[in-house]
């Protein structure tokens, strides 16, 4: 049984799947199969999925929230939101909010700098889907810690952001990270030149000049996150984008209101 206390281990792989690299798996969801040269065996191409998801089989159904029992694999909950590690555990914010984690992508030729998935959870090629719920977050069960989840990879973030809006946000962040960390990017090359000609004083000066004078693209990231969180859409929905710096760029985290235990038909 997986719980929030095991968040740092939140990768779920079935025994029949072949793990090819972090964030991809070989399964029946593969786009196409290919034959290895060594053994002539068919191997599924990698399929991207959210490595932050886990499943939970011991829970109470939404329609009977006081009776906890084991469920079969087809009716296991998919844990798509987690405790808010950015809030103090004794705070009201911790009790009333959750965090949806967007994974990094390593399958698009971008291993040298952080890049996050621009697909809403549940839209990935390797996502777990439910026949009747579609691409909507539908609470199906409640765990012993009082949190509600659905049967699919679709997270509550879909209640607040459309795919288009979400993609715009992630694309903006990815572009900033590319400009910052790309080995042969303009910023890195210029930064090296200035460091050489100033005998190492450039980095010292750059830390002490304001945003308007700094050429560091990461300053743009701080400004973008701050402006996005202050936008009417985010304020009204009571959601927040956590600065990727705070997560060490391991995931792109969205703070959302804690999903409620609503009845489903």
Curated annotation (Swiss-Prot):
It is a peripheral membrane protein. Pfam families: Erf4 (PF10256). Signal peptide: none annotated. It is found in: Endoplasmic reticulum membrane. GO terms for cellular component: endoplasmic reticulum membrane; endoplasmic reticulum palmitoyltransferase complex. One of its GO terms (biological process) is protein targeting to membrane. The keyword Lyase does not apply. Keywords: Endoplasmic reticulum, Membrane. The ERF2-ERF4 complex is a palmitoyltransferase specific for Ras proteins. Palmitoylates RAS2, which is required for its proper plasma membrane localization. Interacts with ERF2. Belongs to the ERF4 family. PANTHER family: GOLGI AUTOANTIGEN, GOLGIN SUBFAMILY A, 7 (PTHR13254), GOLGIN SUBFAMILY A MEMBER 7_ERF4 DOMAIN-CONTAINING PROTEIN (PTHR13254:SF0). This is Ras modification protein ERF4. It comes from Candida glabrata (strain ATCC 2001 / BCRC 20586 / JCM 3761 / NBRC 0622 / NRRL Y-65 / CBS 138).
């Amino acid at each position: 049984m997986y719980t929030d206390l095991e968040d740092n281990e939140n990768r779920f792989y079935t025994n029949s799947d072949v793990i090819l690299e972090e964030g991809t798996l070989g399964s029946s969801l593969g786009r196409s199969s290919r034959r290895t040269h060594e053994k002539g065996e068919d191997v599924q191409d990698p399929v991207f999925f959210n490595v932050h998801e886990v499943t939970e089989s011991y829970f109470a159904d939404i329609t009977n929230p006081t009776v906890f029992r084991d469920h079969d694999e087809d009716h296991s909950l998919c844990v798509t939101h987690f405790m808010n590690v950015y809030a103090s555990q004794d705070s009201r914010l911790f009790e009333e909010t959750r965090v949806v984690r967007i994974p990094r992508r390593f399958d698009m030729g971008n291993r040298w700098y952080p890049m996050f998935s621009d697909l809403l959870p549940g839209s990935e090629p390797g996502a777990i889907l439910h026949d009747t719920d579609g691409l909507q977050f539908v609470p199906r069960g409640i765990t012993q810690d009082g949190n509600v989840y659905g049967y699919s990879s679709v997270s509550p973030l879909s209640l607040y952001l459309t795919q288009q809006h979400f993609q715009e946000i992630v694309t903006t962040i990815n572009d900033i990270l590319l400009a910052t960390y790309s080995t042969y990017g303009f910023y890195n090359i210029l930064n090296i030149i200035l460091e050489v000609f100033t005998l190492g004083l450039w980095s010292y000066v750059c830390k002490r000049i304001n945003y308007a004078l700094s050429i560091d693209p990461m300053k743009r990231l701080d400004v973008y996150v701050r402006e996005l969180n202050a936008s009417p859409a985010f304020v009204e929905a009571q959601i927040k984008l956590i600065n990727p710096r705070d997560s060490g760029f391991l995931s792109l985290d969205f703070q959302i209101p804690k999903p409620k235990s609503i009845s489903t038909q």
